[in-house]
Amino acid sequence: MRAALLEGANPFTVEDVTLLPTGPGEVLIRTEAAFACVTDVIQRRSGGSIPGPHIRGHAGVGEVVEIGEGVERARVGDRVVVATRPECGECFYCDHGQPQQCASAEQPGPDVAVRADGTRLRASARVGAYAEYMKVPAATIVPIESDLGGDVLSTLGCGVSAGLGAALNVADIAPGTTVAVLGAGVFGLSIVQGARLAGAGRIVVVEPLAERRELALRLGATDTIDPGTDAPIEAVRDLTEGRGADTAFEAVGDPAAMRTAF
C-alpha cells in the first residue's frame, strides 16, 4: 500500500510499504479519509516523539475489510470512524477514572508495516491514517451509519471528540454557568457545542476571525469577542457582572491565550 511517512523533522515521503498481518483484537480498514491535525504540523516542526520513520495520521474513516481473532464490535463491510489511540484500561489512571491520562498514551505502539528496505514502521497513535489502509486496535473504531462524507466524519476521530470530551467529560460544566472558549477552530467549536449540551447559561467565544465568530454563534455561543478590538478578560467580566467565567477553555495552543484563560 501507499503511505505517508515522517521521520524526524524531514519532509513527508509517500512510499510503498507492506502491511503486517492483522492480529488478534485488530481491524484492517480501507481508508476513505483522514483528519489532518495541527499535531502533525507540530510533530513535523519539532522532530517528532516517535523514533524512526512512521506512518502519520491519528484519525480517519473507512471500511472494515478484515477483522482479527476476538473482534466483536465490527464486521467486514462496516463503515467506521477511527479515533486516536485508545486507553489501556489497566493502568493507575484508567483505574481511577482518568483515562485521558492513560500511561500508555506516550508509549510507541507495535509495528504495523514494513518499508521496502526492511525497516519496520509504527503508526501515529496506533492509527496511521495517512495510508491506503489502517491496521488498528478494535477499541479504536466506532461503527457509523451516515450519509456524510468522509472529510466530515474523519473529524469525529480527533477534533470533534476532543472538544466535546473536554466539555462533557473533563470540565464537568454545571448548568447555568458561564463558559469562555478561546479560539473557534475545530476544537473550540466542538467545545462550544459540548458546553451547550451541558447546559451552560452563557458561552463566550474569543476569536479574531469574523467568519468563525459567526459560526460559533450558529453552533451555540451566546456572545463573541474580537480580541483585536476588545480586551477578552474585561469583556467577559462586563458580560457577567464582574464575575468572569466559571470555566475557561484554551483551544488555540498559544502561550498568550493560555495566560488569558488562566
Q: What positions do the PLM features span?
A:
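Nucleotide donor/acceptor-binding cores
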Residues: 1, 78, 176-177, 201
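Adenosine-nucleotide cofactor-binding segment
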Residues: 178-184, 194-260
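Short N-terminal strand-loop motif that marks the start
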Residues: 1-61, 128, 132-136
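NAD(P)H dinucleotide-binding glycine-rich loop of Rossmann-like/cofactor-binding domains
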Residues: 30, 88-182
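Glycine-rich beta-strand-centered segment in the early N-terminal region that forms part
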Residues: 20-34, 47-95, 100, 145-148
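N-terminal Rossmann-fold NAD(P) dinucleotide-binding loop
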Residues: 188-189
